[in-house]
Amino acid sequence: MKTVSEDLYQKARGLMPGGVSSPVRAIAPYPFYTARGSGAVLTTIDGTDLIDCCLAYGPLILGHAFPAVQEAIAEQLQDGWLYGTPSLHEVRLAEQVIRDHPSIEMVRFVSSGSEATMAAIRLARGYTGKSDIVKVEGGFHGAHDAVLVKAGSGATTLGVPDSAGVLPDLVRHTLQVPYNDPEALEMLLSKHSDVAALIIEPVMGNIGPILPEENYLREVRSITTAHDVLLIFDEVITGYRLGIGGAQVCYGVTPDLTTLGKIIGGGLPIGAFGGRAEIMKLIAPAGPVYQAGTFNGNPLSMTAGTATLAWLSAHQEIYHHLDDETRAIEEAVIDSPAGAHGSFVRLGSLFKLFFRSSPPRDYIEAKQSDTTAFKEFWDQTLQSGIFLPPSQFETNFLSTAHTEQQIEAISAAYRSCRYE
């Protein structure tokens, strides 16, 4: 007998490419459809409750339908949800973001992380007058042409890290280096004088997580400064995920520009980019670098974001608690069959089991993971009532909503997995 989800997917395949609105959701043989989310639980349209370790791929650090955010949204709805004019709400969120990031003196809000990285790259080119950018192999910075080159996340999952339709003349301006390899960066910048910026996930969240080796980010900062290249930290995942101020505060490295998204919108669509005032003042209408958007700074996203960041700022102890919870999962996995088949990587509330003998240090090593073993593992954890991102190349997340009992259930699901 077919499930409701199976019926919906069959219908959706005739209405939308692949039956979904984003590729990673096309889970074989068919995805489950969600009816509601509450706390750390998703309830499918077929009535199954799943402990959620995907959390919409990162935004929901407070879990689903968090009361303070829900109340803020409900209150704002009474006053409207889109004005097309400035509002108090964007000023408040800007103040919060700037206060939390010493590197950010001015900020522009957009509607997605992809828009944020696209605009930050344009701004870097406008500020420096240079044409090329450098990205890290396997780094994912959204689905726009300049960065769909050896891209991680769903692009690697589907085997299309270099997308069709991206013009070769554009791609030649996107240079690449391996992660955790400062010598390769130094060599590349020594040979190319027309580089405007390096864009990098300080912690590779869209292929892992893959963690920076000791002093790597400091060396990156030193090398880019020496070659007069702007450093853009893509903190769409790590912003407010690792703590107030993100990876740049965690690792003590100051970028020139920062991109944010996910958590800063409290679960509603948002993106942002910011940095030194002298750079940001080139953005229109203050300067000649154009960026605009109908939904930029919309009051609903601003309100949800402000409520989320205010709660996080007032409860910073949760970051230590989340770190303890991923440690508990790691300790449970170590002596299990799953642990014997892979390497557990974690940082704060980010975690992943890579099906390879050691934690990957770059994109090439991550791609050497056994994706067949991962699929077998993923199927078993789903049957145990745990929803993990359905790709070896996506990060798992925890939220403040996960209870001790749910952490134990996640650990038990990992321990119970068996392999042929």
Swiss-Prot record:
InterPro entries linked to this entry: 4pyrrol_synth_GluAld_NH2Trfase, Aminotrans_3, Aminotrans_3_PPA_site, PyrdxlP-dep_Trfase, PyrdxlP-dep_Trfase_major, PyrdxlP-dep_Trfase_small
PROSITE patterns assigned to the protein according to its UniProt record, in alphabetical order: AA_TRANSFER_CLASS_3 (PS00600)
Annotated positions of the N6-(pyridoxal phosphate)lysine modification: 262
GO biological process per UniProt: protoporphyrinogen IX biosynthetic process
Cytoplasm found in the keyword field: yes
GO cellular component terms, A-Z: cytoplasm
Pfam families attached to this UniProt entry: Aminotran_3
Needed cofactors: pyridoxal 5'-phosphate
Location(s), subcellular: Cytoplasm
Alphabetic keyword roster: Cytoplasm, Isomerase, Porphyrin biosynthesis, Pyridoxal phosphate
Superkingdom assignment: Archaea
Annotated catalysed reactions: (S)-4-amino-5-oxopentanoate = 5-aminolevulinate
EC code(s) of this entry: 5.4.3.8
GO molecular function, one term: transaminase activity
Pathway: Porphyrin-containing compound metabolism; protoporphyrin-IX biosynthesis; 5-aminolevulinate from L-glutamyl-tRNA(Glu): step 2/2
Family assignment from sequence similarity: Belongs to the class-III pyridoxal-phosphate-dependent aminotransferase family. HemL subfamily.
UniProt protein name: Glutamate-1-semialdehyde 2,1-aminomutase
Organism: Methanosphaerula palustris (strain ATCC BAA-1556 / DSM 19958 / E1-9c)
